[in-house]
Amino acid sequence: MFRLNTLSALAELAVGSRWYHGASQPTQTKRRLMLVAFLGASAVTASTGLLWKKAHAESPPCVNSKKPDTEDKERNKDSGEVSSREGRAADAAAEPYPEDKKKKRSGFRDRKVMEYENRIRAYSTPDKIFRYFATLKVINEPGETEVFMTPQDFVRSITPNEKQPEHLGLDQYIIKRFDGKKIAQEREKFADEGSIFYSLGECGLISFSDYIFLTTVLSTPQRNFEIAFKMFDLNGDGEVDMEEFEQVQSIIRSQTSMGMRHRDRPTTGNTLKSGLCSALTTYFFGADLKGKLTIKNFLEFQRKLQHDVLKLEFERHDPVDGRISERQFGGMLLAYSGVQSKKLTAMQRQLKKHFKDGKGLTFQEVENFFTFLKNINDVDTALSFYHMAGASLDKVTMQQVARTVAKVELSDHVCDVVFALFDCDGNGELSNKEFVSIMKQRLMRGLEKPKDMGFTRLMQAMWKCAQETAWDFALPK
C-alpha cells in the first residue's frame, strides 16, 4: 500500500512538473526581475540586521534603573530634600578631574553609560537630548512648570564622554519652586553677570527654544551669518529688524542638523516658540523692540558665546592656579575627533610622556589657540601652500600662520603640546591633513554631523539602485 501511494505521488509530481515547464515557463525578463527582487530583499535584510546590531550591540544597563517612584517624586518637592539633591548634583558637576578620578570613572558601568550618552548626543532628536541633559524643573507662582538647562548642562550636552550626574537622566530633574523675587536674588547662581548666559533671563537658565538657538549659533560658521544678513538687508545699510532676523534665524536653523531633526512635541512641552526669548529680543533690539541688529553686533554675540562655552569647558577641568594640564588640553582638542579609542589612548600616552612635570596652560593660551582654529579653513590653505612649496610644517611655521591668518600669538608651549599630539613619526613636523580634519570637527563641536545612523539614506540609495537595475533588465539595450 505504501509503495502504491509513493508511486502515485511521484506520478503526480511528474505531471505537475511537465505542466509547469511546458505551459507556464517564465520569460527571460520575468526571471531577471525575480532575481533582482530576491537580491534586493536579501540586501535589505542583511543591511537592517547589521545596522541594528551596530546600534544595540553595546546597549548599557538602564540608566533609569534607580528612578524614584511616585511617592519619592512627591517627597522631592519638599524644599529640604530639593536643596540636598541640588547640592549633590552640584558637587557631581563641579568635581575636579585628577588622575585618580579618571581611574574611578573607567569602570565598566560608567563606560557603558557614557557610550549610551554619546549615542544620544549623536543620533537623538533635540527634544530627547534636552530632556536627558537638563537638570532643573522650575515651578513658578501660578503652578506652571518648565524644564531648564544650566550653562553647565548645556556644555555637557554637546561634549562627548561627559557623564550626566547620578539619578539625573531622561525626564529626571531637580525640582525648584521660584517666585519672582527669588529668581532675582539667585540670578548669579547659574551664570556670572558678565556671561552671555546672563542675557537669557530666568537667572541664566536655558529653555528649549534657547537651546536650539544657541546650538544653531555655535554650529554655524561666521561666513554663513554674513551671507544671510546680506540677503535680508534690502536697503543695504547692514542692519535687520526683529522680523527680518527671525527669517534669518529660521533659514540658518533649517540648514543645521539640530534644526532638520527637530519636531515639536507638545506632550513634553518642548515646542520651538516663534521668535526669541524676551531677554534676547531686548538684548538685540532694545526695550521697545524697534531697534536694528547689525551683523557686527551679532558676530560679537557669537564670539562671546564661544568664549563663555570655552571658559566653562576650561573650568570643568578644575584648573590649579589658573592652569590646566597638558593632557587635559589634549583631551579638549580630541573630544570631537572621532579617533578610534586605541589611537586616542596612544596619543594621550605620548602627550603624558612628553609632559610628565609640565607647567600647564592658562586660559589665555587656550583661547588664543581656539581663536586660531576659528580660521581653520584659511589655515588649511596656508599650510597647503607651505606643503606645496616643500617647506616643513614645524612650530615656527605654525606660529607664523597664526600671526598672519588669525592675528594671534601662539606660545611655544602650546605648539609643543599640539606637535606632541600630531607629530606621528617624531620628526618635529606636523601631520597637517589629520590635524586640520580633527580641528575642523573640534571647531564645530560635532554639531554639524547629521543626527541619524544613515539608515534612511542607505535605503533610499538601495531603492534607487534597484529601480535602475530592474529598468535595465526589463528593457535591455
Swiss-Prot record:
Effect of residue 233 to A: Acts as a dominant negative mutant that reduces the mitochondrial Ca(2+) peaks. Does not affect ability to regulate cristae organization
Family: Belongs to the MICU1 family. MICU1 subfamily.
Binding, Ca(2+) 2: 423, 425, 427, 429, 434
Binding sites annotated in the UniProt record for Ca(2+) 1: 233, 235, 237, 239, 244
SUPFAM superfamilies the UniProt entry points to: EF-hand
Record carries keyword Transcription regulation: no
Stored PANTHER family: CALCIUM UPTAKE PROTEIN 1, MITOCHONDRIAL, EF HAND DOMAIN FAMILY A1,A2-RELATED
GO biological process: calcium import into the mitochondrion; calcium ion import; cellular response to calcium ion; cellular response to calcium ion starvation; mitochondrial calcium ion homeostasis; mitochondrial calcium ion transmembrane transport; positive regulation of cristae formation; positive regulation of mitochondrial calcium ion concentration
Domain of life: Eukaryota
Family annotation (Gene3D superfamilies): EF-hand
List of residues that carry Asymmetric dimethylarginine: 457
Description of its domains: The EF-hand domains have high affinity for calcium and act as sensors of calcium levels. The polybasic region mediates interaction with EMRE/SMDT1 and association with the uniplex complex.
Positions of the UniProt region annotated as K/R-ring: 128-131, 261-265
Gene disruption: observed consequences: Lethality during the first hours after birth in most cases: embryos are at the expected Mendelian ratio and death takes place only after birth. Some mice survive beyond the first postnatal week and show severe neurological and myopathic defects. Cells display increased resting mitochondrial calcium levels, altered mitochondrial morphology and reduced ATP. Cells also show disorganized mitochondrial architecture.
Record organism: Mus musculus (Mouse)
Biased composition (Basic and acidic residues): 66-89
Name of the molecule in the record: Calcium uptake protein 1, mitochondrial
Post-translational changes noted in the entry: Phosphorylation at Ser-124 by AKT1 impairs its maturation and stability.
Effect of substituting residue 465 to A: Abolishes interaction with MICU2
Cellular component annotations (GO), alphabetically ordered: calcium channel complex; mitochondrial crista junction; mitochondrial inner membrane; mitochondrial intermembrane space; mitochondrial membrane; mitochondrion; uniplex complex
Function recorded in the entry: Calcium sensor of the mitochondrial calcium uniporter (MCU) channel, which senses calcium level via its EF-hand domains. MICU1 and MICU2 (or MICU3) form a disulfide-linked heterodimer that stimulates and inhibits MCU activity, depending on the concentration of calcium. At low calcium levels, MICU1 occludes the pore of the MCU channel, preventing mitochondrial calcium uptake.
Residues bearing the modification Phosphoserine: 124
